[in-house]
Amino acid sequence: MDYLSNNSASYFQNPSQTGKITVEGVFYNPAGTAFLEDGKYFNVNMQNSMIQESMTLNGKKMASNRYAGAPSFNYVQKKGSNSIFANASVVAGGATLKYDEGVAGINLAAETFDNMTRGLLGAKVTRNQFSGQNRYYQLMFGGAHQLTDKLSIGGGLKYVHAMRKLNGHASFGYNPFVGARVGLKGNELYLDSRRRADGVGAVLGLDYKATDTLNFAVKYETPVKLKFKTKATESTDMTLAGRKIGLSDFYPKYANGVNSRRDLPGVLSLGVSKDINDWTVSGGYIHYFNKAANMDGIDYRDGHEVNFGVDYRFSPKWTWHAGYNYAHTGAPKQSYNDTEYAIDAQIYTTGLTFKPTENHEWKFGVGYVKYNSENGEPEITHGIKLDKSKVKYDKEVGVFSLGYTYKF
């Protein structure tokens, strides 16, 4: 599952954002922007993440430790009963990953080659270096309108540009005499691949201010159809039983000339917030309609997130925040591989908001994402068995976010 719900600094203060009326609501609660104070707002955010993604096979941990920065921008113009808005952000994907000590799939391939000869081949990996990145950029424009003093509607159109990159080098050493007996020749594999796609979608929302202290909101994002086109450079001097072997045999969607669908699913978000004196409590639910989307031909289950949080205004200029989010991705084990593994996670957040004047607001947030490590399941790729049930997939992320809003 590719979507990112963390679109601003406010998310890493308190991930329960859908039920709130804020400038960042351009992304979380677009209908709620119709209830902002009149004015023009410009909001900018930067999420700074330290990300470790790892695969452990036979006690050896292969990890990528990388920094990722994700900016986002929101603009709102509110006057009377109407607002217009825009959002530019990284809406899906993640960091650039570099596995300098290799990936599990290549080591599993060496094991398979060795098992073909009951260990006589002596196959071993002599080079195993991979890097890759998935990033989806969004531009969204829309508006909102107050139907009554309690109810508003909002909506917009969005454009998504998606990129998925993979670069890999692998070399194998083995006994050439035994290799010749089983038809194995050559040593080197190389792949440099780019997948790109563009798509459009829509966003619809409702906001209901039941009272001055109680607010409900709903948002629906339509699916975004993305047909990826792959351009790749690949070289190999390896053959098995007369058939050429390439890295694209292990990562078929990254083979040159392959066109494949990997859509962003429809998303339904529900939220509520309640002010109690100097406190605000909030809760939310997000549902990802993965089953209805075409996602590289893999049968994903629907995913969901549940979140809640609190905000405490302990002075006229300062507010403290904290929150929690649980994410069930819906990704089946068969989808886990060297290029991605969408495992379930829990997010813990806290932060501060500083508003020195009516025109300036600063937000600081920190978060820790704890993932539920899982093993994969065996698969057969072009007659080569890869026992991914032996691989433990894991992630760990720490985040510091900074946001600033200026009201004209």
Residue ranges and their predicted role:
Residues 71-146, 150-152:
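Hydrophobic alpha-helical hairpins/lids featuring a short glycine-rich hinge
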Residues 1-96, 341:
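N-terminal, post-signal peptide beta-strand-biased segments of exported outer-membrane/organellar beta-barrel
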Residues 142-146, 150-209, 215-223:
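Aromatic- and glycine-enriched pocket-lining scaffold segments that form the walls
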Residues 100-126, 163-193, 228-257, 373-392:
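Solvent-exposed loop segments that connect transmembrane elements
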Residues 203-408:
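Outer membrane beta-barrel transmembrane domains
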Residues 57-63, 89, 98-107, 156-158, ...:
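"Short basic amphipathic alpha-helical interaction patches in structured regions
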Residues 20-25, 62-68, 131-136, 192-200, ...:
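Short sequence motifs at beta-strands and strand-loop junctions characteristic
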